[in-house]
Amino acid sequence: MKNKLTIIFFIILTIFFHHCSKSDGDKIFAKYADGQLTRSDLVDRFGGKKVNTILSSGSYLNTIQDLVYKKIIFDHHSDLIDNEYIKNDIQRISNDQKLKRVLDYLVNNYSLNDSIISFISTAELSKYTIQDIVVTHRLSYSQHKDRSKKEAHTIANRIKERIETQQITFDEAVSIYVEHPSIKLRNGILGPLRYGKLPKELNDVIWQSSPGQIIGPVETKFGYHIFRTVKRENIDDPKQQNRKKSIKKEIKGGRYGFLDEYTDLQAEQWFHAFGGEIHVDEIDTLWQIADSLGLFVTPNGISIHSLDKTNYNSPLAKINNQNLPISWFIDQAKKQGTYDKSNFVKAYFLYNTLKDMLHRYSAIMWFEKNKTIFDHKKTHRLIKIKQEDYLFDTFMKQEMEKDSTLTNSVILNRLAIQYDLEINDHLPQLN
């Protein structure tokens, strides 16, 4: 009978402590105007195990003070921080973290086909010499100010046709159409070249070609290429043998351009899935107007913010049935990465920056839609932590710039008084 009573007592005691633990589970450590700091806030930042370690230490009050000040500034940042663009900074932190999750997902799920590794392994054992003609345009890296992308593509097709119909030889085509003097002096000859030295689009085509073959137009960042394969040579280099394992590692590290191609392709697919269109001719026109208005400032070029001075309101792109003029991109630049500081010395950089911003925007929308792939709660907790830290640092810097004699403790004491801060200095009972 005594044993039964003892068991019942322990059961009641267990239930009692469990109830107390639950009721004390979100203990309030501090209160302030319109807010409070609870155990849940600490768990969100540090995790449950680390919180117990912190709360059992002699300096736990310092941790609570640090966090409650960050929470006050986060909750009242619109009143405390003078910067009118602070909302953009907060949004940028959120966007950048979501994009990081997407990129991590892509990289972690990138699987290499054995045929790719075999192709590179074989390609590294040969060198190619080619004869190359590049037709440039305003949006290519090698810039031609008087030619649109569409015009360049038309010219490239015409060159290929004239060569194939034997109206001109390839050598004659080089003398007529090659734009760069030093390349013209070499009769358009490039090489011998090892695999990986040229843009990926060219590498892949060249190393699948045979001597005498004429290929093109192939688009790269330099323009449209028409090339003739002149010679293929074998490389007798023991270092290039049996490299399949290291090649796989190098590809996943970004070499050869396969990883970039994969992530760009995914971003392009998401962009189109959301009804995305990019209007190349309008971007070209915007650049020409900006250039004609003298917005180019040496040596930096044209800033993204100065593009609103063009008064060019035609849509540069479209997504989710929304037409996007340059004002949309300027607004997004404030909320994405470091685009807010973008300057363009060539139309090539303008075009690619706008394209990158559209891809980022699409990737973030894709993140928001995929609640099963991504842990949204965990991501949002991390975003909030980074936003709190950023706002705290911004506020402290602002106050010290106003009065360089202020110390951290003085600034925070003023904050405590302003928002009626009360901290519970009793050691909390651990759960």
Model-inferred region functions:
Residues 3-10:
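Sec-dependent signal peptide recognition
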Residues 16-19:
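C-terminal motif of bacterial Sec signal peptides marking the signal peptidase cleavage site
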Residues 21-37, 43-431:
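Peptidyl-prolyl cis-trans isomerase
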